[in-house]
């Protein structure tokens, strides 16, 4: 609180003669609100700079990577926006007007956090940033290798606990979350204390995508988030005694485009061997493609839309100008809906996606319908019996 603010407070503390008591109380309340929000609040109304305190029964967790597409999101559903692009005060104000939290991205080198003093400094820096930007918490996104016997194993759990304690203490109603792989079984050599981290934060965002990051079988193109494999990951988290209410299902709004070394008549696409963290093949042989691009390309494909009944995922084949065959795997409302049923059956905390910018918000009639269908599928369904 700056000195001019203090002087201003003292001036109104002595009631001038003739001012009705209720009017004075209202004035004091307004000034207190402005002081609490800060004089540099960028929002049209100062109360929009106050942190969100409400905790929804069902979480819809949105990752936003920048620009202004957020203006076209389905705000009737959104509960949290994790900002992984440049900070946008307009987004913060608008999200708060809709009762949605806006949280920071948290990333740090695991080698550094072994030092408790470094952890304290990092947390203080992030907390100060959240306060000055009127944000509601932090999403910790650390996808680095950790050896089970290394000092980083315990340091990471300590970082999450200390971050949660600090944010909860300093920002009322704040939220601290942690991103985990689709399975707790040391995916990409990430040996984390998943139960300890889940206990230490508000909830885990399970990244149920990039599930071909380590291909141990045939080097062929496959679904980004195969149905059975995805749900097995959640079963494994729950078997570790992690409360389902600590799990948010993350779904992909993008796919993978693979160049086929060979494309068989029964649509098996052999891909180049690109090793990753010990595995002989990986989805690094392909490139990520947003849903909006996929929807534009599918009509000009050589196969049309195809469906894999085992992986319960859509895909298609196309031929590029150089004559090479490609296979594209992705998720659509049908595949997402099948997986989302698990959320209600096992009472997970909610759903989210990477990332909301992947849809077409141009206003084109066909694109608009496709975009609405992707948002619609996030809504909780009736419990399956």
From Swiss-Prot:
InterPro entries on file: Chitinase_II/V-like_cat, Chitinase_insertion_sf, DIAC_cat, GH18_Domain-Containing, Glyco_hydro18_cat, Glyco_hydro_18_chit_AS, Glycoside_hydrolase_SF
Active site: 143 (proton donor)
Keywords on record: Glycoprotein, Glycosidase, Hydrolase, Lysosome, Signal
Keyword Glycoprotein applies: yes
EC number per UniProt: 3.2.1.-
Cleavable signal peptide: 1-38
CDD domains in UniProt: GH18_chitobiase (cd02875)
Predominant place of localization: other
PROSITE patterns reported for this sequence: GH18_1, GH18_2
Domain GH18: 39-385
GO biological process: chitin catabolic process; oligosaccharide catabolic process
Positions of glycan attachment: 193, 228, 262, 299
UniProt keyword Zinc present: no
Places the protein is found: Lysosome
Entries under Pfam families matching the protein: Glyco_hydro_18
Major enzyme class: hydrolase
GO molecular function: chitin binding; chitinase activity
UniProt GO cellular component terms: extracellular space; lysosome
Family, as annotated: Belongs to the glycosyl hydrolase 18 family.
General function of this protein: Involved in the degradation of asparagine-linked glycoproteins. Hydrolyze of N-acetyl-beta-D-glucosamine (1-4)N-acetylglucosamine chitobiose core from the reducing end of the bond, it requires prior cleavage by glycosylasparaginase.
Protein name, per record: Di-N-acetylchitobiase
Source species: Homo sapiens
Protein's gene: CTBS
